């Protein structure tokens, strides 16, 4: 693994290895032992979008492993005043050992990786969110003991979380169901990837059908535009019937896990009651961002 730009950058073996390393690092952290795996390493933390979990978990993780993490709001760099990305990338590659970038366009992230000459980690793009999905898979494995053979159902917008969960779940040997309203399908290349897995993947517009016998149900915010705008109002109409509620969850297996990448818009993609009933696994999932990202850094920079 040279970079983590999207889940399909990983082989099944590499995915399992990252989760194994994350388990080890989490156990050491809980025991008060954190090896300085990043001693002398410098990590650029580039953010073009607002962030809570991604920013803080990377800052804490780099610090815990003895590295230097520099947070940068890209709007405050010369790139925010028109400097070409290709120039910024070649500069950062001379100062840093690794870069994390939370941005909009996947192609920009790929250009940073191509031109900087250093490992690049996707902190979220409009296309993919691999660090979050690694945390999701870690949480499932902690609570169920395995991933292979379990059914994972995602309900929501077929954007970055759907794209990454589909690929990650299939790589992990899971059955994956994706439930999206018409017009909100996952990316075409992700559906082509999933097609190779045959009956292990199912795409539907029917929430009850998609949730049937699911072991894990995941969702994410699908209305992140400004309230009251035409797009926001249209999404509220398009996603009627796609809110995770206790009644809808009855289609899944008893005691199914419920995951949410956060932030949660209670009353939109998930009911307040269901969110609070499953808060333990949701906030374990948030904590595991720290541990899986440390694992990714350890694999890329410390040869773990």
Residue ranges: model-predicted function:
Residues 90, 97-168, 260:
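Anion-binding alpha/beta catalytic cores of soluble intermediary-metabolism enzymes, centered on
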Residues 1-56, 60:
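Positively charged, low-complexity intrinsically disordered leader regions
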Residues 65, 95, 115-116, 172, ...:
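Short, structured coil segments at secondary-structure junctions
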Residues 255-256, 261-304:
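Adenosine-phosphate binding glycine-rich loop
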Residues 42-43, 47-95:
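Active-site cofactor/substrate anionic-group-binding motifs, chiefly glycine-
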Residues 48-60, 142-220:
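Glycine-rich phosphate/diphosphate-binding loop of Rossmann-like nucleotide-binding domains
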Residues 195-273:
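Rossmann-like adenosine-cofactor binding region
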């Amino acid at each position: 693994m040279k970079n983590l730009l999207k889940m399909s950058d990983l082989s099944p073996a590499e995915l399992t290895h990252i989760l194994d390393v994350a388990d080890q690092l989490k156990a050491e952290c809980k025991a008060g032992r954190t090896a300085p795996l990043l001693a002398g390493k410098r990590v650029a933390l580039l953010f073009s979008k607002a962030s809570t979990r991604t920013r803080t978990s990377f800052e804490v993780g780099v610090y815990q492993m003895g590295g230097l993490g520099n947070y940068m709001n890209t709007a405050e760099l010369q790139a925010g005043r028109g400097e070409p990305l290709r120039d910024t990338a070649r500069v950062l590659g001379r100062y840093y050992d690794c870069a994390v970038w939370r941005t909009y366009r996947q192609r920009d992230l790929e250009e940073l990786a191509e031109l900087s000459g250093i490992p690049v980690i996707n902190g979220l793009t409009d296309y993919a969110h691999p660090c979050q999905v690694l945390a999701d898979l870690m949480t499932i494995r902690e609570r169920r003991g395995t991933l292979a053979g379990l059914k994972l159902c995602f309900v929501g917008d077929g954007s970055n979380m759907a794209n990454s969960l589909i690929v990650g779940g299939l790589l992990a040997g899971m059955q994956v169901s994706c439930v999206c309203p018409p017009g909100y399908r996952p990316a075409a290349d992700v559906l082509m990837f999933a097609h190779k897995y045959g009956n292990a993947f199912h795409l539907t517009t029917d929430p009850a059908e998609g949730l049937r016998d699911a072991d894990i149900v995941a969702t994410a915010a699908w209305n992140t535009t400004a309230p009251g705008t035409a797009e926001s109002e249209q999404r509220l109409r398009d996603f009627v019937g796609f809110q995770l509620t206790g009644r809808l969850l009855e289609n899944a297996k008893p005691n199914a896990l419920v995951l949410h990448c956060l932030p949660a818009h209670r009353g939109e993609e998930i009911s307040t009651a269901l969110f609070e009933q499953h808060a333990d696994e949701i906030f374990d999932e948030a904590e595991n961002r720290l541990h899986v990202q440390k694992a990714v850094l350890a694999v890329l920079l410390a040869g773990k």
